[in-house]
Amino acid sequence: MGQQFVWRLQSRFSSIRRASVILQHLRMSKHTETAEVLLERRGCAGVITLNRPKLLNALSLNMIRQIYPQLKKWERDPDTFLIIIKGAGGKAFCAGGDIKALSEAKKAGQTLSQDLFREEYILNNAIASCQKPYVALIDGITMGGGVGLSVHGQFRVATERSLFAMPETGIGLFPDVGGGYFLPRLQGKLGYFLALTGFRLKGRDVHRAGIATHFVDSEKLHVLEEELLALKSPSAEDVAGVLESYHAKSKMGQDKSIIFEEHMDKINSCFSANTVEQILENLRQDGSPFAMEQIKVINKMSPTSLKITLRQLMEGSTKTLQEVLTMEYRLTQACMEGHDFHEGVRAVLIDKDQTPKWKPADLKDVTDEDLNSYFKSLGSRDLKF
């Protein structure tokens, strides 16, 4: 009788333990499904997975607040030798920030636009100064905030599915997240062209442009990641060696590049002017179908954003990244107070009529005085690192 009682008791405890394990697993699964960002220690690396695939892994303030402290922790950890960042879902690395939420918060008098840009730029700077090898797998759409999470890192791996763009002038903003630093440092006037037109680079062109350091076929990304994770106490040179070997074996996207083979001379000559008006005049004088297409595109953009962007890149070409991010923070706060950003969000993301009514509507009406007001110091509210 006593023995049977013990067995029953053991059986009950076993059932409770089993139920507890199942419940814990379900909780973890639910957390994994709903967590916006996954932060995992795997092999020799810290792995960051942007986990909002239905929203193309759009970057939120909540995600930034999880990534930044973990990045700093892994940077200090002697057992973490590299950091990998990637996007879930196969369509996007990160398509940018939640621009609509920014506009709505500003109209409601909330501080999201101050907090998000400040903390995002501090994270961008931390990525640039990270003492551990940082590998961004930019497979799929990479725009805006996604560019900030990748382009400042030591290694950026593009695939045939990569799509890079900085389309902010079309919504009354400017190419931020350090765009004023990295864009003017691309070959020739390529960065100025990308910034003013929002032109989309695809596949191998993302590597040709210098946005990516390596190109790997997307079907090989998983094995590349596993090989990186399996490295024993790797140095930056060891990581580079693995990336180089996969880059050398890549077969996808070998077609010649129209943008680099046919249009770079035009881009360099037309976009070398010091004013947006003169860039447009250069394009008119060129008169080629490519040039005329760029005129059409530029004429749809916010005139204020175009002038801000050109000055941002010209000034950024001689500044440090921290100086650029400080400048860009000032610009974001001024744009939040202005008309064009909220009008751009309305036309592109809310009503989706694609016909924003810019104010001013003409380049000639955006004065130097207007422009200076965007670049002025915020005093005690300036960005601090």
UniProtKB/Swiss-Prot annotation:
Kindly state a single biological-process term from the GO annotations of this entry: valine catabolic process
Principal localization reads mitochondrion
Transit peptide limits: 1-32
Catalytic reaction(s) noted: 3-hydroxy-2-methylpropanoyl-CoA + H2O = 3-hydroxy-2-methylpropanoate + CoA + H(+)
What domain of life does the UniProt record list for this protein's source? Answer: Eukaryota
Question: pH dependence, per the record?
Answer: Optimum pH is 7-9 with 3-hydroxyisobutyryl-CoA as substrate and 6 with 3-hydroxypropionyl-CoA as substrate.
Query: What pathway, per the record?
Result: Amino-acid degradation; L-valine degradation
Q: Provide the leader sequence positions.
A: none
Q: Which UniProt keywords apply?
A: Acetylation, Branched-chain amino acid catabolism, Hydrolase, Mitochondrion, Phosphoprotein, Transit peptide
One Pfam annotation reads ECH_2
State which tissues express it.
Answer: Highest activity in liver, kidney and heart. Low activity in muscle and brain.
**Official protein name in the record:** 3-hydroxyisobutyryl-CoA hydrolase, mitochondrial
Which organism encodes this protein? Rattus norvegicus
